Amino acid sequence: MSVDPACPQSLPCFEESDCKESSPMPVICGPEENYPSLQMSSAEMPHTETVSPLPSSMDLLIQDSPDSSTSPKGKQPTSAENSVAKKEDKVPVKKQKTRTVFSSTQLCVLNDRFQRQKYLSLQQMQELSNILNLSYKQVKTWFQNQRMKSKRWQKNNWPKNSNGVTQKASAPTYPSLYSSYHQGCLVNPTGNLPMWSNQTWNNSTWSNQTQNIQSWSNHSWNTQTWCTQSWNNQAWNSPFYNCGEESLQSCMHFQPNSPASDLEAALEAAGEGLNVIQQTTRYFSTPQTMDLFLNYSMNMQPEDV
């Protein structure tokens, strides 16, 4: 009877030893109802073992992700360096452009030809390039640059030079009569006729010159009339003197037939007539007065006779 109860007590001890060997966790010995829990824990253990590799794979992905993120960063400097290298390669290409240095004789020939003809044909440029030992492109570019320089120079200096010409060269080069016309043309290059007409026709100098011309013409006309009057005076004086001589001769013809008293009266009358005629010719020069005195002297002779 005493042996039977000891046997069941020994069995749990063996089981405890087995349990300790199977798992490190302490297991309380008890009835058989605790066995299913042990089986469940043993079933869960492989599940945990199968799930445990997943974090390791995530860790690998996390470790790979920085590598992938750093890889483009390593590539970007290479692209920037390539672009900088390309730019450095392009800069020397621009500096490699060399300008052709022309000699003095070549420049003289080119300038002479440019002054005569600014635009050359293809054949003319080829001939000129052969003469100067230059290429066609060099001659062409030189003419293009020279045309641009001349246009720029004209654009910058033409208004200043035109004003200087109008102010300085207008007075000495043209006489006073045509200065107004010249200034009108330069001041008003667009061709406004009212402005030009006002300057030319209303100019005081031009009107004064026309007045002077008119006065000069009047003076010349007066001198001509005065000369004609003096000539007429000479022409009228000569017949009066002749008339006086004829009266004296007529008186002399009547000497033998007339008495002494009549002769003296005729001489006195003739002398008075001559004195009157001489005085009138001095103070009067019109033909009307001369006609009057001529008639008077002619009328006096038959009465005295």
UniProtKB/Swiss-Prot annotation:
It is found in: Nucleus. GO terms for cellular component: intracellular membrane-bounded organelle; nucleoplasm; nucleus. GO terms for molecular function: DNA-binding transcription factor activity, RNA polymerase II-specific; RNA polymerase II cis-regulatory region sequence-specific DNA binding. Residues 241-305 are annotated as: Sufficient for strong transactivation activity. The keyword Iron does not apply. Pfam families: Homeodomain. Residues 196-240 are annotated as: 8 X repeats starting with a Trp in each unit. Residues 95-154 bind DNA. SUPFAM superfamilies: Homeodomain-like. Belongs to the Nanog homeobox family. May act as a transcription regulator. When overexpressed, promotes entry of cells into S phase and cell proliferation. This is Homeobox protein NANOGP8.
